[in-house]
């Protein structure tokens, strides 16, 4: 099928297969369609069907709460075309210049628990992938409706294995499926890479990373990229990792290694929302600082007296992301220096 997308100033067209979402079809062909989560959660990929027939796969998607289906509103990530279609979108239409996302097969291996409700796993790919630090992929499993977005923990080019973090969520069918049976050697569909909240050393900026829970995954990729590029030789960095209690924190050894490789220019603070920090430093990983409070509040306190000369990356639950953005802007950070991909 042919899909034509329009806004007030431009029109672009692309082909769409019968079994793929309109969003994925456009992205893999280099059309920069609007999206954030790509899984039905955020609502950013909304469009209006002006002509043609479509099939909405997940009518109850949270991101569709404000749509007007009677006027033809859809989420492109949850919609397949049944004929040639014309869609109206509210954002600019551009051709992607960087690597385009594609569909691959993946095999889950090395699944291991990090905490009571967080696990790490490796995803072995059927074809190599090149991605930027901070990007994510969407996984789909047979028999489980919809896709789930996961940020890469690792960083490299032309890789055939991704490191990912899984957070168990109440009522989450995919996370329950993974946790209950520890699905090693299981196959999944993979679409990516996706995401615009990326780190590029050539921008030559100081960096702040603020993450809640499993949101630390993408920050680990950013830190890996920065350390490999020796970014912290000439630039400062600060990481704020929010968890409920110290027992909920993970990747601490790796975070400690990043501080050791930073020429003294990277600081890492664990923000404990449900526990009083007994000491100012972690007992085992003494390079890591401890603070009590919500992660966005801890970050605001620490950054209050600092010059706003940094790029800030945010990842975590949508409520946490929204609170952090408001806090940063109130503290004087300009919106163009805040980067995040909102999914959760």
Label each PLM-derived region with a short phrase:
Residues 220-230:
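Histidine-anchored nucleotide/phosphate-binding helix
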Residues 50-53, 92, 142, 193:
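Short, surface-exposed secondary-structure boundary micro-motifs
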Residues 74-97, 186:
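Short, structured interface segments
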Residues 134, 215, 317:
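Short, conserved phosphate/pyrophosphate- and ester-handling motifs at nucleotide-, phospho-/glycolipid
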Residues 100-187, 205, 243-245, 271-275:
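Ferredoxin-reductase
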Residues 1-79, 85, 237-344:
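Reductase modules of NAD(P)H-dependent flavoproteins
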Residues 192-203:
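A short, basic/flexible loop-to-alpha-helix module at the beginning of a structural domain
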């Amino acid at each position: 099928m042919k899909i034509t997308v329009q806004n007030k100033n431009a029109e672009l067209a692309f082909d769409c297969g019968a079994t793929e979402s309109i969003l994925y079809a456009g992205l893999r062909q280099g059309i920069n369609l609007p999206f954030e989560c790509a899984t039905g959660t955020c609502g950013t990929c909304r469009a209006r069907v002006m002509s043609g027939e479509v099939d909405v796969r997940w009518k109850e998607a949270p991101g569709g709460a404000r749509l007007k289906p009677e006027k033809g509103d859809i989420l492109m990530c949850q919609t397949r075309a049944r004929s040639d279609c014309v869609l109206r979108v509210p954002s600019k239409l551009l051709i992607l210049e960087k690597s385009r996302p594609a569909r691959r097969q993946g095999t889950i291996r090395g699944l291991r628990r990090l905490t009571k409700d967080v696990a790490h796993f490796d995803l072995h790919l059927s074809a190599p992938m090149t991605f930027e630090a901070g990007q994510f992929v969407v996984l789909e499993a047979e028999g489980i409706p919809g896709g789930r977005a996961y940020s890469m923990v690792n960083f490299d080019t032309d890789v055939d294995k991704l490191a990912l973090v899984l957070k168990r969520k109440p009522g989450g069918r995919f996370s329950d499926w993974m946790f209950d049976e520890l699905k090693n050697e299981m196959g999944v569909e993979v679409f990516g890479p996706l995401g615009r909240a990326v780190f590029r050393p050539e921008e030559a900026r100081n960096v702040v990373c603020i993450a809640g829970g499993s949101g630390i995954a993408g920050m680990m990729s950013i830190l890996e990229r920065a350390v490999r590029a020796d970014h912290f030789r000439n630039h400062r960095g600060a990481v704020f990792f929010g968890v409920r209690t110290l027992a909920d924190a993970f990747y601490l050894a790796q975070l400690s290694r990043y501080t050791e490789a930073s020429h003294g220019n990277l600081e890492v603070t664990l923000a404990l929302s449900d526990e009083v920090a007994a000491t100012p430093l972690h007992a085992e990983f003494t390079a890591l600082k401890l603070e009590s409070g919500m992660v966005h509040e801890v970050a605001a306190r620490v950054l209050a007296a600092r010059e706003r000369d940094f790029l800030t990356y945010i990842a975590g639950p949508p409520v946490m992301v929204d609170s952090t953005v408001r806090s940063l802007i109130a503290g004087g950070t300009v919106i163009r220096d805040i980067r995040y991909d909102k999914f959760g």
